[in-house]
Design a protein with these regions (language model features):
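Carbohydrate-associated surface elements
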Residues: 14-17
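A short helix/loop element that forms part of the nucleotide-sugar donor recognition site in Leloir-type
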Residues: 24-37
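Short donor-sugar binding/catalytic loops of nucleotide-sugar-dependent glycosyltransferases
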Residues: 36, 47-52, 79, 101
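A conserved mid-protein helix/loop that constitutes part of the nucleotide-sugar donor-binding site
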Residues: 42, 50-65
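Nucleotide-sugar-dependent
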Residues: 54, 102-109, 116-137, 142-155
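Nucleotide-activated donor-binding/catalytic signature segment of Leloir-type glycosyltransferases, i.e.
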Residues: 68-77, 83-107
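A charged, aromatic-enriched C-terminal amphipathic alpha-helix characteristic of glycosyltransferases
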Residues: 169, 173, 186-216
Length: 217
């Protein structure tokens, strides 16, 4: 927009906010979903649209390389690749796919993991943060981001120390990062605290609404 208006129009980017009152940190063992599923160990979760743009083949390739049986993967959502994920999970003891979950259940299912996976397709950087990221932060979950390091979410992760970055289409690097995170799982508490703090401050609803008010006043 700035380029098209040649600087003649003031442009301000206001992000979405986190639903901090509806979503907050819980131990995964205290969630309804965790107690319904036959899943254990250290859990990485991908929740959201399971489409072609999410780089899911890369994730599945990385999972196939992970040999540590104490690491599990939970996929939640629907989309064009849902049947592929379901079939993959039927072949892997440490992979579970449960399909679409209602948004009203976010507090429960976002907390049914130790680390949340977020992806962003190539060429999408600069267009904002994947919306699910805000409530992942509200749940106090570290983010394993797969995508361009110049993207908004990558910059957010680096600035506030709320997760890790892996370049897309590199299953070996992703596998190594997954294993690194597991090996250093005892140090996650500071990242968890950072995630919730960012949701409570930078992406608090009141703060975002005040920015709209200031802009429109």
């Amino acid at each position: 927009i700035k380029r098209k208006t040649k600087g003649k129009t003031k442009v301000e980017l206001i992000p979405n906010w986190a639903d901090n009152k509806e979503v907050f940190p819980l131990r995964k063992e205290d969630t309804r979903l965790y107690n319904q599923l036959e899943i254990s160990g250290f859990i990485f979760q991908f929740a959201g649209n399971l489409g072609y743009a999410q780089g899911l083949d890369n994730i599945l390739s990385a999972i196939s390389l992970v040999e540590n049986k104490n690491i599990s993967f939970l996929f939640i959502g629907g989309g064009a690749k849902a049947e592929v994920i379901k079939a993959f999970g039927e072949q892997k003891e440490n992979v579970i796919y449960i399909g679409f979950q209602e948004r009203s259940m976010q507090k429960d299912f976002l907390n049914t993991c130790d680390v949340a996976i977020v992806t962003l397709s190539d060429g999408m950087y600069g267009l904002g943060v994947p919306s699910k990221s805000y409530n992942i932060m509200a749940a106090g979950k570290p983010i394993l981001y797969i995508g361009d390091e110049k993207s908004e979410i990558a910059l957010c992760i680096k600035e506030y120390n709320i997760g890790w970055l892996v370049k897309p289409d590199d299953p070996y690097s992703l596998k190594n990062m997954i294993e690194y995170i597991y090996q250093n799982k005892d140090s996650l508490i500071s990242i968890q605290n950072n995630a919730r703090l960012v949701a409570d401050t930078v992406f608090a609803k009141e703060r975002i609404l005040n920015r709209y008010y200031a802009l429109l006043s």
